[in-house]
Amino acid sequence: MFKFTFALALCVLAAGLVLAQHNPHWWGNRNTIVHLFEWKWEDIAEECENFLGPRGFAGVQVSPANENIVSPGRPWWERYQPISYKLITRSGNEEQFADMVRRCNEVGVRIYVDVLLNHMSADFVGQAVGTAGTEADPAVKSFPGVPYSAEDFHPSCEIYDWNDRYQIQHCELVGLKDLDQSRDWVRTKLIEFLDHLIELGVAGFRVDAAKHMASEDLEFIYGSLSDLKIEHGFPHSSRPFIFQEVIDHGGQEVTREEYNSLGAVTEFRFSQEIGNAFRGNNALKWLQSWGTDWGFLSSGQALTFVDNHDNQRDGGAVLTYKSPRQYKMATAFHLAYPYGISRVMSSFAFDDHDSAPPQDAQEELISPEFDADGGCANGWICEHRWRQIYNMVGFKNAVRDTEISNWWDNGDSQIAFCRGSKGFIAFNNNMYNLAEVLQTCLPKGVYCDVISGDLINGSCSGKSVYVGDDGLGFVSIDSDDFDGVLAIHVDARI
C-alpha cells in the first residue's frame, strides 16, 4: 500500500511540474510576448522601462545568450551555433544580461531566452573562435569551453529522410554537431546552463530544434531544473515556462503531440493559415472557428505567431513586415481572437536569408534609433512599435478572460466580433467598402479606434465610433483605407 501511495504521489508531482511549465508568469492582465530579435541587452532593458512596460507587454523573447561562433559577415544564424555556455555574445556580457533581466522584471516584463540544447557549431573553415574568444574544433567535435568531446555527440550523419525518426533525432541538422542528450555529462552541462539563467532571473526558455531531441530526454532535463527565483518576483515553487520549436505541418514522423505535455509548442500551422487568410487565399468568414477546429493544438499549449525569425525568410504564405497592411490586419486578428499564447515579431530589415542585423564597421551590433513617431530607423523594423500592433497589445490586455460573441460577416472577407462587453473589432479584406451598423457589445459612449489613432489626454487622433444605449455602432472601413481593421475597447473610451 505504501509503495502504491508513494508511486501515485510521484505521478501527481510529475503532472504538476509539467502543467507548471505551461505558465508564462505574466503580470496582471498582460498577455503578449515580443521577440526582440538580435537586440543588445542594454537596449532591451531600456525598451522594457521606456516602452514595453508602459505599453503592457508581458515578456520578451531574447536571442541566444551563450557564446556562439564568429562567422564571416556575421549572419543572424551564427547565434544558433554554440561554442560554449559562457554568457558573452554581440548582445552583451553576463553582467549586462543580468542587469537587463533585473530591470525588465522590475517593470513587469518577463524574459524568455532562446536556448540551443540540440547541438553545437557546425564545421568551420579555419580555426573556430567564439564571441568570448573560446576556440573549438567542430570537425572533431571538440568544444573545450564546455567541455564536450566526440563521445558527447551522436555519430555524424546527414538527415536525408524526414520520415525517419532516427535521422531526425540523431543526425546533424544542417551540419550542426548533434549532442547526445541521453548522456549524463551532456544532461549535466545543459541543466547547469539553464539553471544559471534561472539564477539570473529569467522566466523561461524557447527551446530551439526541440523535435530533433527525444521527448524523454527533454522531459528529464526540464524536470531537473531549479524553480524560478522568488527574489526576482516569482511565487514559491514556480517552474520555468517552456515553449518548444516543433515544426509540424501534419503528416510528420515526429509530431508536436510528443512535446505538448512538456510545455507549449510553436504552432506553425497558425502562422501558415493566418497568412493564407489575410493574403486573400481564404475568406475571413471561415476564421469564426479559428483554433482547434483548424487542427491547431489546444489554446494553452500553442505558442502562436504571424511570423518568426525563421519563416519570415522562407517566403510562401507567411506574412511579414514587407506586406505591412495585411501584416497589421493579421496581427490584429491574432491579438483579438482568444486563442494561443501570443508572440509578436520585432525584426530587422533583410534582403536575403542570411542578412546580418544592423552593425557598424567593426561588426558590432548597433542600437535602434527612433523617429519622431516612435518608430525605429537605421535598419531596425520594430513592428512592436507600430501603432496598429502596440495598441492591439493594449486591446488584448483590456479584453482578457472574455470570449467571442456577436460574430458578424458578409459571407466573404468582412468580419466583426465582440470580446465580451469589453472590446469590438472589425476587418475588411474585400475590394469594396464596409459600412454597417453592428453590435459592439460596449456600453454607451464614444470610443477611439486604436488602429487609426491613439487616445491622448481624452482626444482621439484617429477615427471614433459612437455606441448607443443598445450597443450598436456605425462601422466604416473603406477598401482603400490605410488599415483594413478597426478596434475599440473599454479603455479607449473618449
Swiss-Prot record:
Subcellular location, record wording: Secreted
Cofactor: binding comment: Binds 1 Ca(2+) ion per subunit.
Requisite cofactors: Ca(2+); chloride
GO molecular function annotations of the record: alpha-amylase activity; metal ion binding
An example Gene Ontology CC term for this record: extracellular region
InterPro entries referenced in this protein's UniProt entry, alphabetically: A-amylase/branching_C (IPR006048), A-amylase_C (IPR031319), Alpha_amylase (IPR006046), Glyco_hydro_13_cat_dom (IPR006047), Glyco_hydro_b (IPR013780), Glycoside_hydrolase_SF (IPR017853)
Subunit record text: Monomer.
Record-listed Pyrrolidone carboxylic acid modification sites: 21
Organism superkingdom: Eukaryota
Signal sequence bounds: 1-20
Catalytic activity: Endohydrolysis of (1->4)-alpha-D-glucosidic linkages in polysaccharides containing three or more (1->4)-alpha-linked D-glucose units
Active site annotation, chain numbering: 208 (nucleophile), 245 (proton donor)
EC number: 3.2.1.1
Keywords: Calcium, Carbohydrate metabolism, Chloride, Disulfide bond, Glycosidase, Hydrolase, Metal-binding, Pyrrolidone carboxylic acid, Secreted, Signal
UniProt site positions, description: Transition state stabilizer: 310
Any one GO biological process: carbohydrate metabolic process
Residues annotated for chloride binding in this entry: 206, 308, 343
Chain positions recorded as Ca(2+) binding sites: 118, 169, 178, 212
Cysteine pairings via disulfide bonds: 48-104, 157-171, 376-382, 418-441, 448-460
Entry-linked PANTHER family: ALPHA-AMYLASE
Keyword Ion transport part of the UniProt annotation: no
Protein family per UniProt: Belongs to the glycosyl hydrolase 13 family.
Name of the protein this chain belongs to: Alpha-amylase-related protein
Organism: Drosophila pseudoobscura pseudoobscura (Fruit fly)
Enzyme category, top tier: hydrolase
